[in-house]
């Protein structure tokens, strides 16, 4: 675990974080919670993008933090989407209790001001890459989060 205040560029630079919000548009309550949480997010951070289709290009170096609305599956999908450009992820659970997304939306409202000022801890997870080779040729490659 790492203290985010020692690693987060926005804290070191004294600026608001640039945040991407990722959510699965087909999940129950996603749109309702987006409408409720976006003003709160925007009051403490600069909203870079809202991605409801897991298609955002994370290769841009400008983003600081990803908020995922959903469950563990949504966080795993976001980690795959970020590939080699991993950012800290704050998972907000909109379904059953999750291992990675253990923060419920009501609690998010309480802790968000602390997160943006670096008063939180980041748990680092290992990313795995698996490639399949046939006759010396790479046929496919997948990346995943080791939870």
Regions inferred by a protein language model and the residue ranges of each:
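N-terminal glycine-/serine-/threonine-rich phosphate-binding loop
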Residues: 2-70, 74-85
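Conserved beta-strand segments that form the floor/walls of ligand-binding pockets within enzyme
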Residues: 20, 93, 143
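Short, glycine/serine-rich, charged loops/turns that create anion-binding
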Residues: 26-27, 94, 104
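Alpha-helix termini
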Residues: 37, 77, 83-86, 104-111, ...
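Glycine-rich loops and low-complexity Gly/Arg-rich segments
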Residues: 44-48, 91-94, 114-117
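Gly/Ser-rich helix-loop-strand patches that form or flank binding pockets
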Residues: 77, 81-95, 99
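Catalytic core of DAGKc-family lipid kinases
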Residues: 99-147
């Amino acid at each position: 675990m790492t203290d985010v205040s020692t690693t987060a560029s926005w804290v070191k630079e004294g600026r608001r974080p640039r945040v991407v919000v990722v959510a699965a548009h087909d999940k129950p309550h996603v749109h309702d919670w987006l409408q409720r949480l976006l003003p709160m997010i925007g009051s403490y951070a600069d909203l870079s993008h809202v991605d409801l289709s897991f298609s955002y290009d994370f290769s841009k170096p400008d983003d600081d933090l990803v908020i995922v609305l959903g469950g563990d599956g949504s966080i795993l999908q976001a980690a795959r989407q970020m590939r080699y450009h991993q950012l800290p992820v704050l998972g907000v659970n909109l379904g059953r209790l999750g291992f990675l997304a253990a923060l419920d939306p009501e609690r998010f409202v309480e802790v968000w001001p602390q997160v943006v000022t670096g008063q939180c801890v980041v748990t680092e997870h290992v990313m795995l890459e698996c490639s399949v080779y046939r006759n010396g040729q790479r046929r496919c490659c997948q990346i995943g989060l080791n939870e």
